[in-house]
């Protein structure tokens, strides 16, 4: 089988709550780090989430 083109990444909350989302990204098309504004249920607000490696 061929190697998959997408890799799994973590989107970690910048509110330092430890909450994260897991999503996929194609590193050939999206070379820079992803940032999204998503909901953090720990602080109950929308905050910025930044890309981090899955350990």
UniProtKB/Swiss-Prot annotation:
Family annotation (InterPro entries): Ribosomal_bL33, Ribosomal_bL33_CS, Ribosomal_bL33_sf, Ribosomal_zn-bd
A GO biological-process term: translation
Record carries keyword Membrane: no
GO molecular function, one term: structural constituent of ribosome
Cellular component, GO annotation: cytosolic large ribosomal subunit
Gene3D superfamilies the UniProt entry points to: Ribosomal protein L33
UniProt key word Ribosomal protein: yes
Pfam families: Ribosomal_L33 (PF00471)
Keyword tags: Ribonucleoprotein, Ribosomal protein
Family of the protein in this entry: Belongs to the bacterial ribosomal protein bL33 family.
The protein's name: Large ribosomal subunit protein bL33
